[in-house]
Amino acid sequence: MLDDVPSILWGEDSNRVYVHVHGKMSRKEYAESFAAIAETKGCQTLSFDLPEHGERTDSERCDVWNGVADLRTISDYAFANWERVSLYACSIGAYFSLNAYNAMPFEKALFHSPIVDMERLVKNMMLWSGVTEAELESKKEIPSSVDTLRWDYYQYIISHPITQWNIPTAIL
């Protein structure tokens, strides 16, 4: 547990670690397969539960604000305890990472099925659900088949596009 964020440290002691950020409908334990591979390369893996996932089913919303706060807690710990820190992130975890870590000195990043254009994804969700921008602004929250559409979240992603990412990255 790191500052009330449930976490697992996988692998034998090393000066290298991967911060493992899972995707939607996942949890920290799903890092086990990745951690086994990373360990063969001499790396530990630090995985954790995002809000509304794993041990945090009754916690805050899993949104960019809470996700980024958790990622910063985890990275602060990682950079304080390992010499070489890399990143593995999946889906929404990659989007949160793009927001939280754009200026962090990660050695490298591995993105698995990353969400890199959240604005496009939300606009598609609105289209699929028959929701207009005006309707979302008026109602503030509208359930959809994928997830709840939220006006504040939509406004955040429009005003905070990902414009910089200087970490060497591979898309898996």
Q: What residue spans do the PLM features occupy?
A:
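Short beta-strand element of the alpha/beta-hydrolase
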Residues: 15-23
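A short loop-to-beta-strand scaffold at the N-terminal edge of the catalytic core in hydrolase folds
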Residues: 2-11
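Conserved alpha/beta-hydrolase
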Residues: 35-57
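Catalytic nucleophile-loop/oxyanion-hole region of alpha/beta-hydrolase
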Residues: 25, 54-79
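The alpha/beta-hydrolase serine catalytic core
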Residues: 105-172
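The serine-hydrolase catalytic nucleophile loop
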Residues: 23-36
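Short beta-strand immediately N-terminal to the catalytic nucleophile in serine-hydrolase-like folds
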Residues: 87-89, 112
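Gly/Ala-rich beta-loop-alpha elbow adjacent to hydrolase catalytic centers
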Residues: 89-97
